[in-house]
A protein has these predicted regions:
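Transmembrane beta-barrel architecture of outer-membrane proteins
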Residues: 90-92, 138, 183, 236, ...
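Periplasmic alpha-helical coiled-coil/stalk elements that build and connect Gram-negative outer-membrane
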Residues: 8, 131-242, 343-346, 350, ...
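Acidic, low-complexity, intrinsically disordered peripheral segments
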Residues: 74, 398-438
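Bacterial Sec-pathway N-terminal export signals of envelope proteins
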Residues: 21-69, 101, 177, 216-256, ...
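Amphipathic alpha-helical coiled-coil segments
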Residues: 41-56, 128, 132-152, 162, ...
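Bacterial N-terminal signal peptides that target proteins for export
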Residues: 1-10
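Small/polar (Gly/Ser/Thr/Ala-rich) solvent-exposed segments
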Residues: 40, 63-88, 98-127, 249, ...
Length: 438
């Protein structure tokens, strides 16, 4: 048996060589936020809402209209009028300027409502980006772990082949059992199966990475979460989430939008006051031969006295929409708190599990070394050594699961507190961060 190789595999139970590549998790997240169609779609929605807000502000700017026309005009005067019938080619043009002065603050509230809508979509964009970053972290960790498991599986198969070679020599020389050889052959078949599964899992994780990030992995490095962004207590974490989580900010902006919508609906209870100025030019119009001009400058008041009760019904409808938005805000607080506590518990239990699994790896490694020494003095068989080697292989896989679960749990907590993008040092476009004022 190649005992030096066996010792290396046993004593270095947690040392797995990972190739040095340049693509960090932070780079993968940045690339995803730049190219992922879901994020681009969310940004387009935000940009659209910004233009809706710009459009609503136009209602408080002057409106200038040009009206022009040419056509036939025939006039048949009454009998009392001395002149006869007239047939003219009527020509006219007018320019009208209208400036809104006051409309019960309906336009002002509409401007604020559309701004609140845009702000809500902006925070939703940040929430989507944070969730997408967490998704990238998951597939990134899975891909790195898959490579480590593949290396474990390769080393495990190599150890099985070494032991098989030694037992085969012993059987050939007549001092070994063919039953032992058959049993090792079965173990080798299983080791081959583990290797094939590891290869398939590595391929799957790379495929998912490519779909999400937009390019194939250029090489992945085990990431370490910045623990400065992990609160010390769950209560501190909840307070941070209430302040920073974009989902809560979405709910708050939605309440503001509903509030402005309700106020806007009550603007119809008041008159609309505007200034209108116009200049009109006519030629051969109204039965008069020749040109005539008309200039107007008016302060107008329009007041709807009755509208079949529709305005009252609309106001009542928007009042209930406001109550609905407040209920959704409360639901957002509860959902964020629930998600945070689940993430916190997952991290706490994963840390505990990792400690136990680390002890398991250490004990299994020491057992293999002890069995090796006992084999040399005839107290153990190679099958005994192989059994402990299999236990060590499974222990190392379990530890890897816990190791990567711990990192992902940390990222989950950061996402649940609304700090994941900051923790990853991801620079999002400035327009994602600029508040829409209202």
């Amino acid at each position: 048996v190649k005992w030096n190789r066996l010792k290396y595999a046993c004593c270095c139970s947690l040392m797995v060589s990972i190739p040095v590549f340049g693509q960090t998790l932070e780079q993968a997240v940045t690339l995803t936020l730049q190219n992922n169609p879901d994020i681009k779609s969310a940004f387009n929605e935000f940009t659209s809402k910004r233009y809706v807000n710009d459009a609503s502000t136009g209602a408080y700017l002057p409106s200038i209209d040009l009206d022009a026309g040419i056509g036939y005009e025939g006039l048949d005067p009454s009998d009392e009028v001395a002149r006869g019938d007239t047939d003219y080619t009527r020509k006219e043009a007018s320019v009208t300027l209208t400036q809104l002065i006051w409309d019960g603050s309906a336009t002002l509230n509409d401007i604020d409502r559309t701004a609140a809508d845009a702000e809500s979509v902006r925070f939703q964009l940040l929430a989507d980006a944070s969730d997408k970053a967490l998704e990238v972290a998951k597939v990134y960790l899975d891909a790195v772990k898959a490579y480590e498991v593949l290396k474990l599986s390769e080393d495990n198969l190599a150890v099985h082949k070494d032991i098989y070679s030694d037992i085969s020599k012993r059987v050939t020389s007549g001092i070994g059992s063919t039953a032992d050889l058959t049993q090792v052959e079965a173990r080798i078949a299983k080791a081959h199966g583990n290797l094939a599964a590891a290869q398939n899992n590595l391929y799957d994780t790379h495929t998912m990475f490519t779909r999400l990030v937009g390019q194939s992995p250029q090489g992945l490095i085990f990431p370490r979460a910045d623990e400065n962004f992990l609160p010390y207590t769950v209560d501190e974490a909840v307070s941070t989430a209430y302040e920073l989580h974009p989902v809560i900010q979405v709910a708050l902006a939605d309440v503001d939008s509903a509030k402005f919508q309700y106020k806007q609906s009550k603007g119809v209870y008041y008159p609309t006051i505007s200034i209108e100025a116009s200049q009109t030019w006519r030629d051969d119009a109204d039965g008069l031969k020749g040109r005539s001009d008309e200039t107007l400058a008016m302060l107008r008041l329009r007041y709807n006295l009755f509208n079949g009760g529709s305005d009252v019904a609309n106001a009542d409808s928007f009042a209930y929409q406001l109550n609905k938005a407040k209920d959704l805000r409360e639901s957002a607080y509860r959902n964020v708190e629930e998600g945070l506590k689940l993430s916190w518990t997952a991290l706490d239990l994963t840390l505990q599990q990792k400690e136990f699994l680390s002890d398991h790896v250490d004990s299994a490694s020491e057992t293999v070394i002890a069995y090796e020494k006992q084999y040399k003095i005839g107290q153990r068989t190679l099958l005994d050594v192989l059994n402990t080697q299999n236990e060590l292989f499974e222990a190392r896989k379990d530890y890897l699961d816990a190791k990567y679960a711990e990192q992902f749990a940390k990222y989950r907590v950061m996402n649940a507190t609304g700090q994941l993008l900051s923790a990853l040092r991801v620079e999002v476009p400035q327009e994602w961060l600029d508040k829409v004022e209202y």
